[in-house]
A protein has these predicted regions:
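A broadly conserved sequence feature marking short terminus-proximal activation segments
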Residues: 1-34, 133, 147
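Short functional micro-motifs and their immediate structural scaffolds
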Residues: 46, 60-61
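Glycine-rich active-site loops that engage anionic ligands at enzyme catalytic sites
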Residues: 72-130
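Well-ordered alpha/beta subsegment
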Residues: 101, 110-173
Length: 173
């Protein structure tokens, strides 16, 4: 059965034929962040794929991760293409390096997952929160239920983590 829902007025549909994403969003629907772990080399991977990008082995299992990490990079959207996002501009899309598997299998490798910046209750972040988050900010995952058995993973500032004094942000022109 496909996973269907609605996120900010947009229809979300993950068909069973897309086994990897169906499983990923199904775990998110249980409010668990899980990633694939290769049955051969043992390395974890995200986003979900049909084979390990490190050794090409196809078999994997889904393992839980902490859901905590550091902003590795970000994009700040000021002119939304999707009409539904216009009322939320500026908003951020964060690329977060998870705490697990840093610098593996080689230096500068890691588990990195993209998602929007949100408030702790799963709403898109207001402009004042967007302006405070930059590279180095510590975040944790939150889930926004969008349908039966499906949730959208989002990032929010981890209030329990030590934060950088001034996270790096792109210079304002």
């Amino acid at each position: 059965m496909p996973l269907t829902g609605e996120y900010l007025g947009m229809r979300v549909h993950v068909d069973e034929l897309d086994q990897e994403n169906h499983a990923f969003f199904g775990w998110c629907g249980r409010h668990e962040l899980r990633v694939q772990q290769c049955a051969s080399c043992g390395l974890k991977r995200v986003p979900p794929t049909t084979a390990c990008p490190f050794c090409a082995h196809e078999a994997s299992t889904w393992v839980p991760v902490s859901g905590r990490g550091t902003v590795y990079s970000y994009g700040e959207v000021h002119h939304a293409i999707q009409p539904v996002f216009r009322e939320f501009t500026p908003y951020q899309l964060l690329l977060v390096e998870l705490d697990e598997q840093r610098n593996e299998p080689a230096e500068f490798d890691g588990l990195r997952l993209q998602a929007n910046l949100a408030t702790p209750d799963g709403e898109l972040a207001p402009p004042e929160l967007v302006r405070s988050v930059g590279i180095g900010t510590r975040v944790r995952v939150v889930f926004r239920d969008i349908g039966e058995g499906i949730a959208m993973p989002l990032w929010t500032v981890d209030e329990e983590a030590e934060q950088p004094e001034s996270p790096w942000r792109y210079p304002i022109e």
